[in-house]
């Protein structure tokens, strides 16, 4: 009983330790504390076995020991004391207990109580001096913060004396001394030209890390001046990156912090040459990060930092390759990051002196030539990236032959003239984990990957077991077959990208042996045939599978498929046939992207698809699917895009759709019938219903806040345009063309935004999923080969613009695609009548307006001159009258202008864009004159038949149609009244008229039977 009780107490004490403290113990002294603890427990158990004659009872000693265990656990958890620090003495006490002698125990008990209180005394919160200093810092920070953000300034920092400042946000303390050792201040909305008074930091004498990414403009200290940071003698890390607007004026302050080992000035908009001389006193500096600025050479003074091990100059504008001569003198460098600069020319030979270098990133520059032969001296090199440079000609890997530690190699060229030397004499000593060779006109896989094989096109020997984990040879010219034994040769492969090449033939069945592979992209090749059974059953670790744009055939994923972990599946643009079977996808809750578009699938849309609860993108467009749309399919909660267009679907539209964050719904080119539900626009961002057989009127839509593209072209919609359309405040593209709408154009359409003020919103559907995978980790390269699964779905929007019905694409990963700038309204080919509302001229962001092929009358509103961004204006095939407003010549963006086949008259305006329009824009308007027509506005009409032989000037003024109609009606009425008056008097004319009438009546009667 007693044994069980004490063991139970021991377990409870162990579980009382906080996970963070346990992790800290493991990091500093892994295994030591626990080994000692287990040893003491074993010692205690041995003493029990040796005392078999002693009857074990639940004595006061055992109870006190248990209480001590609890106290030890609580104090250790609260104060940051390691578990061994208190448990071991107490376990020692229990293991040495003489269960027969209470006095001896009490003596030891008193001793351990004293020691326990001593441990408790060592557990300290923050000291009062630093607590007051933190409150002063907060007060100062509030004084330089914008008033709107004052509530967000260190809300947990308060003046409550019972509050432990070591528990405040942005603070880290030493658990033993209670002194502040880290202060982190993130991005803040500070007032303009805000300076930090460094003297406020002086009370933090043991601070080791300062992170001030807060939008500051500089430092100030009216007492200590530039030497202010020298008072922080323990300061090792100073991070001033991001959101700061520092310039070189802060460098004298920084130079005083001679204890610094790490300095980051990343992303501070610093320009021009960096004065390394001004930080020459930082002789202990090991890491210097100046990335994401606008710095350029020279680099003189860098050699003062002799202990520097990591240098990051990426994302700047360094250009001269000769500037690297200074870097070559930094022989203690471990990591050098020079990517995304403007270095031009060949790599200098002196880089071979950096024999301690582990990481070298030269990507995204303008380097050319080849690798220097001196690279064979970089014996410590593990990571080399030469992506996105301007290499041309033959590129040799021979300088890398002896680099036994090389794990990561990346190469690509912005030029299409680079060719890889795939065969060479030296035998390469490295075993790469990551290979990226893109856009290199590669026709063969390099020999260092294939080793001792026959060097035909991409063949591998059966005996190779390569340690390669990441292989990217996409966007090359490799043709032929994948080797049959690729799965045996690369069994450890985790990710492979062979997209955009010219591979042919079947997919090798040996790929089923790649049981560890998680990402496979073979899209945009010429593969054919069925998917091998071993492949669909063996690669059970696959999460991302892209086989798009090939010629695979057969049934889509048989029932025995083992792709149970799939998150992204793209098999679009192939030749898969048959129905969409049940398979194992029916129970997959991790699948996020499923694209089966552009195949030959038949049958109904299976109802089990609604069980794919994690689905965000579903595209089954351009197949031969029939039946109705399952309502449950559109109710999936996370669905953001569904494309069922280009099928043979029938039935009615669903009344509403799901999607927590807005859905893009493409149902065009089907055979859907019936009315459009008034609730359909709820939570819908894009609705494409073009070319169906929908009928009825435009409904009184409810909840229209989300919709910004509405396309209903080519249906059988009737009735007038609903004024509810005026509530589409966020609309960008509105297409109601090719229907049977009638009535007037609502003047309230000027309420439509056609270009929202919030430019951050975008049309695209981009679901970017990051799958962490540490292929390589260093100071600057952390999870460098994290594969970002760009699960975006390109959206195709067809809209009439510039006399063409074109496709516009969006939904790239970024929000600057073409759809973000497309604002248009198409009401053409309907039966609309009446005047064109002048209020439409208020749609200043509109780029396309098409009102052609209607029955619109009156004149062209002069307010259209306010359409500053208009590119295409089509008013053809109406009954418009009057002249073309001269103000329209101010439309500098106008490319297409069509007013053909109307009743317009007068002089055609000239100037600016109107000088570019040809005669086709004005056909069918006989009363228009001037260029580009052949009708002169100054033509004279002569009369050779006049009696006096004189000439009368022909009036070429435009016909006033209103006056013409009025005079014609007056003449008609006057004639009728005159005839009526004549009939009222007895005169020869009246009698003659009556005789004619009588004769006509008699003639008609004689003709009747």
Curated annotation (Swiss-Prot):
Main subcellular location of this protein, as a coarse class: membrane
SUPFAM superfamilies linked to this entry: L domain-like (SSF52058)
Transmembrane annotation, as ranges: 962-982
Cited InterPro entries: Leu-rich_rpt, Leu-rich_rpt_typical-subtyp, LRR_dom_sf, LRR_N_plant-typ, RLP_Defense_Trigger
Keyword Transcription regulation listed: no
Cellular compartments annotated: Cell membrane
Glycosylation sites: 159, 197, 267, 390, 402, 497, 516, 526, 551, 588, 611, 716, 751, 850, 890, 903, 934
Biased amino acid composition, Acidic residues: 945-955
Region annotated Disordered, chain positions: 934-955
Side Cytoplasmic, residues: 983-1009
Stretches in topological domain Extracellular: 23-961
UniProt membrane topology term: Single-pass type I membrane protein
Swiss-Prot/TrEMBL keywords: Cell membrane, Glycoprotein, Leucine-rich repeat, Membrane, Receptor, Repeat, Signal, Transmembrane, Transmembrane helix
Signal peptide: 1-22
Residues in LRR repeats: 204-231, 232-255, 257-281, 282-305, 306-329, 331-354, 355-377, 379-402, 404-427, 442-465, 466-490, 492-514, 515-538, 540-565, 567-587, 588-612, 613-636, 638-660, 662-681, 682-705, 707-728, 729-752, 819-842, 843-866, 867-891, 893-916
Superkingdom classification of source: Eukaryota
PROSITE patterns to which the protein is assigned, alphabetical: LRR (PS51450)
GO CC aspect terms: plasma membrane
Family indicated by similarity: Belongs to the RLP family.
Identification of the protein by name: Putative receptor-like protein 8
Name of encoding gene: RLP8
């Amino acid at each position: 009983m007693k044994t069980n009780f004490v063991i139970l107490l021991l377990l409870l004490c162990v579980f009382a330790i906080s996970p963070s403290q346990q992790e800290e113990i493991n990091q500093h002294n892994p295994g030591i504390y626990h080994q000692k603890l287990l040893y003491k427990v074993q010692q205690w158990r041995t003493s029990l076995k040796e005392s078999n004659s002693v009857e074990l009872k639940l004595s006061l000693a055992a109870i006190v020991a248990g209480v001590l265990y609890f106290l030890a656990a609580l104090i250790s958890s609260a104060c940051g004391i390691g578990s061994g620090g208190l448990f071991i003495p107490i376990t020692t006490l229990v293991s040495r207990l003489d269960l027969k002698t209470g006095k001896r125990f009490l003596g030891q008990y008193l001793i351990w109580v004293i020691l326990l209180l001593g441990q408790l005394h060592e557990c300290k919160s923050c000291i009062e001096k630093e607590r007051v200093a933190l409150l002063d810092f907060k007060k100062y920070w509030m004084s330089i913060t914008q008033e709107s953000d004052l509530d967000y300034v260190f809300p947990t920092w308060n003046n409550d004396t019972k509050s432990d400042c070591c528990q405040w946000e942005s603070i880290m303390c030493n658990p033993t001394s209670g002194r502040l050792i880290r202060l982190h201040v993130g991005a803040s909305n500070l007032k303009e030209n805000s300076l930090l008074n460094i003297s406020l930091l002086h009370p933090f004498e043991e601070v080791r890390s300062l992170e001030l990414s807060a939008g500051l403009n500089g430092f100030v200290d009216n007492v200590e001046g530039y030497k202010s940071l020298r008072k922080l003698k323990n300061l090792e890390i100073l991070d001033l990156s991001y959101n700061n607007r520092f310039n070189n004026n802060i460098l004298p302050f920084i130079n005083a912090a001679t204890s610094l080992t790490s300095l980051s000035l990343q992303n501070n908009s610093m320009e021009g040459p960096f004065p390394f001389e001004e930080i020459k006193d930082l002789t202990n500096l090991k890491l210097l990060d100046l990335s994401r600025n606008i710095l350029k050479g020279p680099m003189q003074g860098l050699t003062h930092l002799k202990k520097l091990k990591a240098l990051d100059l990426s994302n700047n504008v360094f250009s001269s390759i000769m500037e690297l001569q200074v870097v070559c003198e930094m022989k203690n460098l471990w990591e050098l990051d020079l990517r995304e600069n403007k270095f031009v020319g060949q790599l200098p030979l002196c880089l071979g002196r950096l024999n301690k270098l582990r990481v070298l990133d030269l990507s995204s520059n303008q380097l050319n030539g080849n690798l220097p032969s001196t690279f064979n001296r970089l014996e410590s090199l593990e990571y080399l990236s030469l992506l996105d440079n301007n290499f041309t000609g033959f590129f040799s890997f021979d300088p890398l032959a002896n680099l036994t530690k090389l794990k990561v190699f990346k190469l690509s060229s912005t030029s299409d003239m680079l060719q890889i030397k795939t065969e060479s004499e030296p035998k390469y000593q490295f075993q790469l984990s990551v290979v990226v060779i893109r856009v290199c006109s590669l026709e063969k896989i390099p020999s260092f990957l294939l080793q001792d094989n026959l060097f035909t096109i991409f063949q591998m020997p059966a005996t190779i077991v390569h340690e390669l984990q990441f292989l990217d040879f996409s966007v090359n010219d490799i043709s032929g077959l994948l080797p049959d034994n690729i799965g045996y040769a690369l069994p450890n492969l985790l990710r492979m990208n062979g997209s955009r090449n010219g591979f042919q033939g079947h997919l090798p069945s040996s790929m089923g042996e790649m049981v560890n592979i998680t990402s496979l992209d073979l899209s945009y090749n010429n593969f054919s045939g069925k998917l091998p059974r071993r492949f669909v059953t063996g690669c059970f670790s696959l999460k991302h599978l892209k086989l798009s744009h090939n010629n695979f055939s057969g049934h889509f994923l048989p029932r025995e498929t083992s792709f149970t972990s799939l998150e992204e599946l793209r098999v679009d643009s192939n030749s898969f046939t048959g129905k969409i079977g049940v398979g194992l996808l029916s129970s997959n809750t991790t699948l996020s992207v499923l694209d089966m578009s552009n195949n030959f699938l038949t049958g109904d849309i299976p109802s089990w698809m609604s069980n794919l609860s994690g689905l965000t993108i579903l595209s089954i467009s351009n197949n031969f699917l029939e039946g109705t749309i399952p309502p449950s399919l559109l109710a999936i909660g996370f669905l953001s895009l569904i494309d069922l267009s280009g099928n043979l679907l029938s039935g009615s539209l669903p009344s509403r759709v799901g999607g927590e964050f807005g859905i893009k719904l493409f149902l065009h080119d089907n055979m859907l019938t019936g009315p459009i539900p008034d609730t359909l626009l709820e939570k819908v961002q894009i609705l494409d219903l073009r070319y169906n057989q929908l009928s009825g009127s435009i409904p009184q839509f409810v909840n229209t806040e989300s919709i910004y593209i509405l396309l209903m072209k080519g249906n059988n919609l009737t009735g007038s345009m609903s004024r509810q359309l005026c509530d589409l405040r966020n609309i960008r593209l509105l297409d109601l063309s090719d229907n049977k709408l009638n009535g007037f154009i609502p003047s309230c359409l000027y309420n439509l935004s056609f270009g929202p003020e919030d430019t951050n919103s975008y049309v695209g559907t981009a679901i970017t999923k990051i799958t962490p995978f540490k292929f390589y980790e260093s100071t600057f390269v952390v999870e460098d080969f994290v594969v970002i699964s760009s699960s975006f779905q390109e959206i195709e929007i067809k809209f009439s613009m510039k006399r063409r019905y074109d496709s516009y694409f969006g939904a790239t990963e970024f929000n600057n695609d073409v759809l973000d700038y497309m604002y248009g309204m198409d009401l053409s080919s309907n039966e609309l009548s009446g005047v064109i509302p002048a209020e439409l001229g208020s749609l200043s962001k509109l780029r396309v307006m098409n009102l052609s092929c209607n029955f619109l009358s009156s004149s062209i509103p002069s307010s259209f001159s306010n359409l500053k961004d208009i590119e295409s204006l089509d008013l053809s095939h109406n009954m418009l009258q009057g002249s073309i407003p001269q103000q329209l010549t101010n439309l500098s963006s106008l490319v297409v202008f069509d007013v053909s086949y109307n009743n317009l008259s007068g002089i055609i305006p000239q100037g600016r864009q109107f000088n570019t329009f040809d005669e086709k824009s004005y056909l069918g308007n006989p009363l228009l004159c001037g260029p580009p027509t052949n009708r002169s506005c100054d033509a004279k009409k002569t009369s050779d038949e006049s009696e006096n032989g004189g000439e009368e000037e022909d009036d070429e003024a435009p016909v006033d149609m209103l006056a013409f109609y009025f005079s014609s009606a007056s003449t008609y009425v006057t004639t009728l009244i005159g005839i009526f008056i004549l009939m009222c008097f007895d005169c020869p004319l009246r009698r003659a008229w009556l005789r004619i009438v009588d004769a006509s009546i008699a003639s008609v009667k004689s003709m009747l039977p």
